[in-house]
Amino acid sequence: MARIAGVDLPRDKRIEIGLTYIYGIGLTRSQEILAATGVNPDTRVRELGDQDVAALRNAVAGYQVEGDLRRWESMNVKRLMDIGSYRGRRHRAGLPVRGQRTRTNSRTRRSAKRTVAGKKKAPSKK
């Protein structure tokens, strides 16, 4: 099993897909890395040689991935909260940050709705 950037890549996947298991590397960046290192994207992870793995490690080391990227993102959010910007206040309140509506929807960000058992709607007066 190839270990790159502290992540064990799945042995049976193509290396193009396997690299996307590293936080911060998507399909496009994976393809860029493979083109730069000269590794065939259709190669399975288990078929990689030691030289290929070393070349991939060096290429991935040039990007901000995994723990460093997570830390960078959390520091940016913390900075927004500390300066008291609108986005920071929305993060702190656990509400959508990018202008989505909240009267309806936004359940993921606001937490699941709890229904009270036995509570009925008031009968409508006619």
From Swiss-Prot:
Query: What are the start and end residues of every segment in region (Disordered)?
Result: 91-126
Q: Which domain of life, per UniProt?
A: Bacteria
Alphabetized, the UniProt keywords read: Ribonucleoprotein, Ribosomal protein, RNA-binding, rRNA-binding, tRNA-binding
Keyword Transit peptide listed: no
GO CC terms of this entry = cytosol; small ribosomal subunit
Write down the InterPro entries for this protein, in alphabetical order.
Rbsml_uS13_C, Ribosomal_uS13, Ribosomal_uS13-like_H2TH, Ribosomal_uS13_bac-type, Ribosomal_uS13_CS
The UniProt family comment states: Belongs to the universal ribosomal protein uS13 family.
Q: What organism does the record attribute this protein to?
A: Acaryochloris marina (strain MBIC 11017)
GO molecular-function annotation terms?
rRNA binding; structural constituent of ribosome; tRNA binding
The task this protein performs is described as: Located at the top of the head of the 30S subunit, it contacts several helices of the 16S rRNA. In the 70S ribosome it contacts the 23S rRNA (bridge B1a) and protein L5 of the 50S subunit (bridge B1b), connecting the 2 subunits; these bridges are implicated in subunit movement. Contacts the tRNAs in the A and P-sites.
UniProt cross-references to PANTHER family, sorted A to Z: 30S RIBOSOMAL PROTEIN S13/40S RIBOSOMAL PROTEIN S18, SMALL RIBOSOMAL SUBUNIT PROTEIN US13M
Q: What is this protein called?
A: Small ribosomal subunit protein uS13
Q: Which GO terms describe its biological process?
A: translation
- Which Pfam families does its entry note? Ribosomal_S13
Q: Partners and quaternary state?
A: Part of the 30S ribosomal subunit. Forms a loose heterodimer with protein S19. Forms two bridges to the 50S subunit in the 70S ribosome.
Alphabetized NCBIfam families for the sequence: uS13_bact
Q: Which segments show compositional bias classed as Basic residues?
A: 100-126
